[in-house]
């Protein structure tokens, strides 16, 4: 009997799947066909932070030979993952900007052909502000990113975020007033861990956990 498709991808699993993807892609496309994947959203957060334990799918920007599609499917079949566990649907959302890749950073390389990159912290925050979805985890993700950087004494300032918003979207015009107010509030918060727990609790009541 076939297993039900897995709907949650954790940090450890993400690395396993990307490693397998590198192997499968190399088998199909050869060692002279390099590929690049830029992890966006939940995937970027899983790769770089510990506050988020899982994501239901991995949003990415993919530059690769046509064999990548088959490689993705093979990994999905091997690990009983949901269809489109790794996809480019993000490019059709409001938070997408063609400039995002300019502000990505190296994460890991697999099988000497697949380079995986992620998005810098302030750009993750900028995209979450642009999305501003209450039915997702956008606001709690912002706090989580700020919180973990504070714990490492790597302060993210309003200026850093402002620069990211301008670089991606040209101005703050597309950011809602609610999102702007939220950002100012959390940047002045003295206990981000407590604020994060409170917001996650309210998201849990809405069925977002």
Predicted ranges, named:
Residues 1-209:
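Compositionally biased terminal segments of proteins
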């Amino acid at each position: 009997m076939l297993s039900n498709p897995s709907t949650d991808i954790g940090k450890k699993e993400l690395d396993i799947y990307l490693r397998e993807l590198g192997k499968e892609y190399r088998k199909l496309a050869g060692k002279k066909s390099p590929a690049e994947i830029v992890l966006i959203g939940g995937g970027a957060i899983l790769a770089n932070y510990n506050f988020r334990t899982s994501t239901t799918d991995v949003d990415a920007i993919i530059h690769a030979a046509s064999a990548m599609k088959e490689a993705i499917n093979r990994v999905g079949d091997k690990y009983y993952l949901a269809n489109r566990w790794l996809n480019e649907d993000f490019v059709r959302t409001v938070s997408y900007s063609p400039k995002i890749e300019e502000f990505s950073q190296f994460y890991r390389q697999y099988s000497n052909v697949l380079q995986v990159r992620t998005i810098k912290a302030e750009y993750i925050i900028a995209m979450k502000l642009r999305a501003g979805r209450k039915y997702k985890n956008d606001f709690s993700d912002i706090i989580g990113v700020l919180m973990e950087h504070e714990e490492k004494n790597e302060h993210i300032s309003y200026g850093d975020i402002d620069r990211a918003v301008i670089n991606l979207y040209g101005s703050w015009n597309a950011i809602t007033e609610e999102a702007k107010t939220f950002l100012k509030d959390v940047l002045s918060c003295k206990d981000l861990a407590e604020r994060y727990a409170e917001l996650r609790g309210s998201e849990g009541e809405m069925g977002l956990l």
